[in-house]
Amino acid sequence: MLLFDGITLPLEDPILKFLLILVIILAAPLLLNKLKIPYLLGLIIAGAVIGPHGLNLVLRDSSIILSGTAGLLYIMFLSGLDMDMSDFRKNGTRSLVFGLYTFCVPLLLGILAGYYILGFSIYSSILLAGLFASQTLIAYPIVSKLGIARDKAVTIAVGGTVITDTLALLLLTVIVGMVTGNTDDMFWYRLGISVVLCIAFIMQLFPLIGHWFFKHCSDNISQYIFVLVMVFLGAYLAHLAGLEPIIGAFLAGLALNRLIPRTSPLMNRIEFVGNAIFIPFFLIGVGMLIDYRAFFRDWESIKVAAVMIVLITAAKYIAALLTQKTFKLSSDQRTVIFGRSEEHTSELQ
């Protein structure tokens, strides 16, 4: 579609595309604060409006996907970097229990709903249930901004997210292997060994590498680039091991946690660049995936969407409630855990 001389829709000029996204990132908080709409939600809505299913101003091309992937990894890395390690160890059992709750409850409800309500096959129902069980930390910047990132409930929710995402991806790997007939003994040995080696490599060697680098390099730019290298290296190692890359980014954050003090200039740079560029690009990219017209094409789409929304909300609330009752948490902490576990993106697509 031709607008002006040399300007067509969707925008092809990289300068115009980048300018438009920067204007959205700049204007969104100014407008949305007056409307009492959360900043993160506003960026997702903006992505839906300008994306291929909206006004078609910008395509979700490789540059948007790259920036969005970096943003999601950045969120997971920051959650690991912000973690109070002593509190994380203290609440490790609670995170494990919550992770099992928030994986098993949605998994069970998802399989039943997929098979009996939606009429899917058993394998399709299990895959759908895996999407129910998985979650991300998309709202972590809000939690960090509110100053509750080190609260016990947040620690439990973050740890539980890693557990449930790991289990969900392993489930996906197993189902794919079963469908293709590759679940022999070597499949299980290879999967188990690769996961253990990946976790051990990141948690044991990353701190040593980081300590050596920070000791021998004092250049601010080089230190920040080194951190980015560690984030993406951890994510890729997790991918090679058969895990979700966000797990590797989170482990990289935990591994470098003690090397980057909370009030250090490097930490300020990490948070600034993430909150200003990477994370907003990710949220806008998520919005571009939304095709609102799909809800009006046929009754089946509305039915599937309604079942997913109701069951995911119910399952995650039940998991948060069970966690509260098990560990005698307050109702506010239950609400925080529930809110943190309802966050979904396209991480399993």
Language-model region placement:
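Structural signature of hydrophobic alpha-helical transmembrane segments
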Residues: 6-20, 60-77, 121-136, 189-201, ...
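Alpha-helical transmembrane segments of multi-pass membrane proteins, especially transporters
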Residues: 21, 39, 43-44, 94-103, ...
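Transmembrane alpha-helices that form the ion-translocation and gating core
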Residues: 31, 85, 90-149, 289-346
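Membrane-interface alpha-helices at helix entry/exit sites of multi-pass transporters
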Residues: 90, 149-165, 170, 185-189, ...
